[in-house]
Amino acid sequence: MSIASVKTPSSLREAQIQSLEKLLNLNQDVNELESSPQHASNFPIWKVLIFDKAGSETISSVLRISDLRKHGVTVHMNITSFRQPIADVPAIYFVQPTQENIELIIEDLSKGLYESAYVCFSSTISRALLEQFAELASKTNTSHMIHQVYDQYLNYVVLESDFFSLQLPKIFHTFHNPSSDEALINSRVQDIVNGLFSVIVTLGTIPIIRCPQGSAAEMVAQKLNQRLKDHLMNTKDAFVSVNPKPRPILILLDRTVDLIPMINHSWTYQALIHDTLNMQLNRITVESVDDGKMTKRFYDLDGNDFFWESNASKPFPKVAENIDEELTRYKNDASEITRKSGVSSLEEVNVDAFADSTYLKSAVSLLPELTARKQILDMHMNIATALLKAIQERHLDDFFQLEDNITGLNRSAILACINNKEQGTPEDKLRFFIIWYLSVDSVPASDLQAYEEALVNNGCTLEALNFVKRVREITKMTMLASSTTRPATGQTGDNLFRGFSSLSTRFTDRFKEAGIGGLENIISGVRNLIPFRKDGTITSIVQSLMDPGSSPASKQTESYLLLDPKSARAITVNNDPRAMNKRQTFSEAIVCVLGGGNYLEYGNLADWAREQNPKKRIIYGSTDILSPSEFMEEMASLS
């Protein structure tokens, strides 16, 4: 078995794309293939790509069909689907190492579906399963058709530049369910270790590991540390060679360290989308009613979306303003081209007609870029329209304002929110109350009873709250939310919400068509609100571990376990005098939360990292990325 060597690019997404491109070129370096005279004439080799569900999720999150074609993939199919023979081309199998998958591969080869097979397992195949694979190939006389078997270490999904998911559902439920037996917990811990090991291989450097003691995070940390030690001892792969870059810190945390970000009503673009629309693996589903029929539109986000790249983490009113500005810029650029070419619209522009005019040809050459820009802006206009409708229907601006000043609310304000028939869904109200309940020091029993009665009377079921009541004291002890707040994106007051006004003015007809009225009323409720970025608990923990000397939270993380896969033993900072030298600063961190992650936390960490001087890099991920509704459902299942 072998690990495909990779360089260390500027982001996890770029690193994973490099690894996938190498996989698509039969585990040969793409740059070498393109530059070598010996191979250039035959590049790319045409081939078939076969994947399972996990492989499909990994690829589709970072590559498009055009990217697959660029690397010679003419056909891509699921391994469980019916497939016709394509006997004269090789097949790449990108699948999980399971009994079912190896049997399906052997079945394909026995039928002669493809010329040869390049088998790329997304994670490490066990020795027992590998031996069984070899035995099946021998029995069916297909061994000669298997040209490669690789452990690719790609069993995770990248959603943003430095944002990943291990795609392991229900981890929170498993770790907090009293009926989960030891075998199940150990199995899930091993799944997490396998996924994190793959992320580390892709990044090409061995981290120093920190985690709280006596937790599920420690179980993962210990097993991952041993896995890395064994790998360092037994292999000489490129990713463990001398690396001039400083080693990162890997911070492992349990979800119970802070439950609030999972259910917050956020005001940032990407978090609002994840909360109010169906967003899975960078595909957004927008439902609308056209001619009395419910229709669905799908929008795919990718790394080439310039608007998403620069606006995803911004407050939604600022995003609305930026849509307006970008559309104005597009119209000005389009008008310039039509003016120079003497036509009334871009559709009338004939590129061939200007072949002899360098001046006009230069202007017309911008046409493809303009068309792509317009498609992206139209997509975000439609998404913004759907968000505005959700904000109006659920009064999300009210919840955002209440939660922004959650500890300042009194009993009457809380009951008023719960009892307001026009404000939010029952789940919105329960989320709001749980956030308040986790934010205050104590709640009198009589008050709690009154709140619960009000919640039930307004359609709420209390299963999620019952679970939170059990873990409240643990969560309260670990919450380190900083009292320091900073203006979000440098915008304040009316200036921030000017985007709503311009959007309302410019696209009134579009909103009316979508059934959205009274946009000004939505704006007026938040016009005087100054959104501040508060360093959440996990951001405070990360700061204390990356830069111990500058964080007031450092004392609360001193007891965290410190594991160095390159060292012989584990130590904690506060119980070993020699560990004092380990209080080093880090420029890069990998942060993984066990039991669910979210876009709000990712954005908060990214904002903090950008503000540092010099800037820091943080890669954030989780066992699974959950919307507030999904996490509420998981908590309810534990009541």
Swiss-Prot record:
One of its GO terms (biological process) is intracellular protein transport. It holds the Pfam family Sec1. GO terms for molecular function: syntaxin binding. Its main location: cytoplasm. The keyword Cytoplasm applies. Keywords: Cytoplasm. InterPro entries: Sec-1-like_dom1, Sec-1-like_dom3a, Sec1-like, Sec1-like_dom2, Sec1-like_sf. GO terms for cellular component: cytosol; Golgi membrane. It is found in: Cytoplasm. The keyword Lipid metabolism does not apply. Belongs to the STXBP/unc-18/SEC1 family. This is Protein sly1. It comes from Schizosaccharomyces pombe (strain 972 / ATCC 24843) (Fission yeast).
